Amino acid sequence: MNKLNWYDFTVGYLIQAHYDIVKATLIINIDVPRTLEHPRHKEATCFEETFANVNLIFKEVRYLKNIVSANMTSDPNEDAGDTEYIICAPASDELLKELGFGDKKIRLDYGDGTNVSLSWRKEPLMYTKFETAETIFHIVFRELNIVETADKLKKI
């Protein structure tokens, strides 16, 4: 998790996101600059060379809510994927209860009168809120891997 401070999420750009429901895995691909804390920050000779293509790989996703602005698909512009921030912390019992996790059941209300309950086991979970100019991800998961997709510095 400490790798999150290696990147400046206020300046990055969302490239794509893919959710595999069977594997319960979410991959968010972003182009984001490295910070001074990154071990390779000294390799860059200008700001553009600080950017890296990064995959945020959320494993064992238990909850995913993605809010997408109509502008993302109907009138996208060059700023649509601008990243604004990311927070990541242990998911508190209060948050889990608010999201429908409680008493070993996950309660889902589909809004049309349909209610579903699924069994779950109490486990240590993490929560992330990741926001761009046109979309917000709320994710409850067990493990996060942060992987740069190229060995050398990416030039824009």
Label each PLM-derived region with a short phrase:
Residues 1-156:
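Surface-exposed, interaction-prone regions used to assemble/regulate multi-protein complexes
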